[in-house]
Amino acid sequence: IEKPDYWLTNEEPWGHIDYNRSQKVSFGGEVVEENGKKVWKPAWSVRAVPVDYMVPGYASGRVNTLRLWSAKSYDEFDLLTFNKSEYLDAVKPQVKAENISKILYPEDSTPQGKALRLEQQYFFVSASIHDAIRVFYPGQDKPDLTTFPDKINFQLNDTHPVIGIPELMRVLMDEYGYDWDTAWKI
């Protein structure tokens, strides 16, 4: 029988949580036209909090970092809603966000399960892409990302992470202003 592993509740000595390296991941919404350009207006966002584990290599004298992501809400508790005796509604944003990373590969035989699985896949990919840009272009608001392929490769081991291809294209075009052809070359 599978049981939850509450790996972050007991002050895990090997995991390092770094809220300063959190990434914003947005979902849903709509695309609107502004000044002749299509702009995505997300419906909601979560904070992707990195949890790093050091993984020593066998007989190599090297240590690598395994980065896991934990989804957290930007609005964890709504006091006004709580004070109206709407207790469950007061924590809905927190529950919705944390469900994304609570269980890896949740059951997806229902429409809700399929939606959660897709949100989870997108969450991990988007957080990792934004983090890679932050790591390889530190302190740069508008870096020259044409050198991105020289700095990093993403390994797509399964069908799930291939959502990273359109997400990287979206990031390059929407957030960094590249046109389609340049983004595709990157």
Model-derived features: positions:
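A conserved ligand/cofactor-binding region detector
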Residues: I1-I186
